[in-house]
Amino acid sequence: MNRRPTLLAALALTATAALTLSACGGSGSDEGSAKDKDSDKIAGADTGSEKSAPPSESASVTEGRPKIELPPDLSYTFDWSKTGDKEKDAILADSKQSIKAVHLAMANQDALDAAYLYYHEGEAAAGAEKFIQAYVKEEARVTGAYRYYKASVNVSDDNSGSLVYCEDQGKAYDMFLKDEKVNKTPVTKNSYVLYNTRLQKNDKGVWVVTKLLSQRGSDRCQPSA
């Protein structure tokens, strides 16, 4: 994980190759180098954008999937255009939910929250659990606005796939729950993170994240790139 607030930096260092979904402008080291694979597609201008849906709209349309009901102070923009390929578009859709599910676990202060475990398995699940637990210990969660862009998705014949994408955390911060204090930090090069995820389609037809690597300050994710 990257993008850690100062207080949580040391704790999150143990969450190797897991999700980086925290405050703006953190300075910690990377937990893995993202492998740039077939990917530098230009994101559309505010296409596919979305805010956190209200509770009545936030449940997945597929029966049996967990509801992702997030606090109203969290919002998301996904500049991920549909590809027209059924499986690739399913990876994009499930990846949106996997990102939000980690934030939900933080909001619920539950390192074993069912929603993120539904969308993560193996190494990715273990890393996410450690990351979430660091927030639970400090009674903190994330707040603000996240933007995702420059997505490149691939599917293999063995029901595995990959998704490489950028995250803009310039308007995302950590909030401490006891007094609702928000740790606002300046936007820097490190506010932009490149992710490389490995996914597997499980027996429920869900594309679950099995491994996630990240690179903070990636040149490819900078606003001028």
Locate predicted features.
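Bacterial N-terminal signal peptides that target proteins for export
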Residues: M1-L11
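Hydrophobic helical h-region of N-terminal Sec-dependent signal peptides
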Residues: L13-A17
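C-terminal motif of bacterial Sec signal peptides marking the signal peptidase cleavage site
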Residues: T20-A23
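Bacterial signal peptide processing site
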Residues: G25-G28
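Post-signal peptide N-terminal segment of mature Sec-exported envelope proteins
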Residues: A34-S60
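Phosphate-binding/catalytic loop of phosphoryl-transfer enzymes
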Residues: E63
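Core segments of small alpha/beta cavity-forming domains
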Residues: P66-R141
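Structured, amphipathic secondary-structure segments that form assembly/contact surfaces
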Residues: A111-A114, Y118-S224
